[in-house]
């Protein structure tokens, strides 16, 4: 039975009585918008989530892969990680017990040198897993590629077709964990007739979008199934090469929400607020298909009331995300006299935003089927062209979808093309602000190299804090208009390094490493000098010791070598001086002598015969430190960052 839509009188009464208290944005400080509903997780304590397979698959506690030795992957005792080591006798694929259509998937993957595997959506459409470290021009067969299709009947040399290479090579070194996200939409059928091809909306590798809106006309090569259907199992290839997988999370989508019988009433004028909705006749009214502020026909000082029916596909908990973009951080741009928005479902309050913040979220349990829907909002500002209202819904089997008209948002907005900076034939040094771990760094030099290896260096700490390959910097927030945020951001796949000074004096071996430099008597930044190629060497003074810090890419453009040269005058105290090579939750020495940092997110390697660093625990983290040993007043510390 259809539920009646709430009348405007009932909405006004709820507002007047102050009963809209489900989520009240005025009762709490402004905060960032909360995350989407959590995904499903595949428990890797055993293989029960998968169909029976061969002995090449097992559950392990971790995996170690060799950067140098091809196909060398070792499983470590425990649970939480899938490890595949195929043999001639055992090389089966791994298929989930459940099937999917539309799917958002994320997982971590580790590959040894030269290894090859794949993730097959519905057992048919492959995203390639491959050791592509250092590849300059990736193809469909490289990490993150959508693999080609194959047809023997096309003739010799023409069998392979389609296939889409990743937009950029965002892969990491063998033996490091890599993060992969896939947003996939299944083919559509009307009866037995296919009416739409399968599509990869996005493939994101290590934080970089490498595929976007790629259509696949049929199963890719080596698929388990050659036909196409509405659903199929998720498959990880087992017969090509060793691979380890962990942290498998997914959202499977089976339905959609719908607004229907949607009507609106609109008001505009000086001093507008919610009382206008119950005390004055509307200036405009009508029917629409989706939510928008456009029918108000005003940029400032307007109010709207929507009423209609919301249909959801199944019973469960649904999350609503409501945003009114005219609420700002300044006092004149926020508060109950400037803005308010109320979401009401079945006559009950779900969200109230009294102008304290732009975005508010709330969860509500709904039965499957139809529900009375109401949304009211007003803007009472005399300047500023912001008037966008957005409302998203997400729930069981329901992809996060807009209930507003997104096409009108584009018309309201002013799209900005990203402002990019690249290094072409010579290095680039760009000074800017840059965000790091929630803090805006203001003494940053970002350095791009034509070889494709880049880093950001904090001159106030004398240390690099980001390294990456691929595109260099996106500077829109610096150079568009007034440059409101005044910050740049790395455009490639970023590795986060230590958040601390690189060179420090410790009073004893257990003293805490400083997290910043605040005493200019202990640290003085002295700028940088450029070599003949245009690459900088950063200069500083630490406890009277002159420090020269040079970071240089290797000839292949895949690693970054760092050389820290220290010169101590006779008057300087040099006992207790250390260089921090790395810092993270965990630092572990590997069989090849390198050190894996932060759960194998990057490696630190030292030259053969170099002094050995020490790993110590400090405040819940681990540090890789090298005591400085001077010879005739000079010392050099050299190591490489591998990712």
Where are these regions (language model features)?
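Short, well-structured beta-strand segments within conserved domains
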Residues: 105-110, 178-184, 234, 248, ...
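Short beta-strand-plus-loop segments that form exposed binding edges in beta-rich domains
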Residues: 239-240, 375-383
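Carbohydrate-interacting regions of secretory-pathway proteins
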Residues: 28-281, 285-293, 298-307, 311, ...
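Short tyrosine-centred short linear motifs in exposed loops/low-complexity segments
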Residues: 115, 314-320, 328, 368-370, ...
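Beta-strand-rich ligand-recognition modules
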Residues: 165-166, 217-218, 229-230, 346-378, ...
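Short, well-ordered beta-strand segments enriched in hydrophobic/aromatic residues
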Residues: 105, 109, 549, 560-568, ...
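Beta-strand-rich N-terminal accessory domains
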Residues: 29-31, 35-36, 40, 97, ...
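Bacterial N-terminal signal peptides
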Residues: 10-21
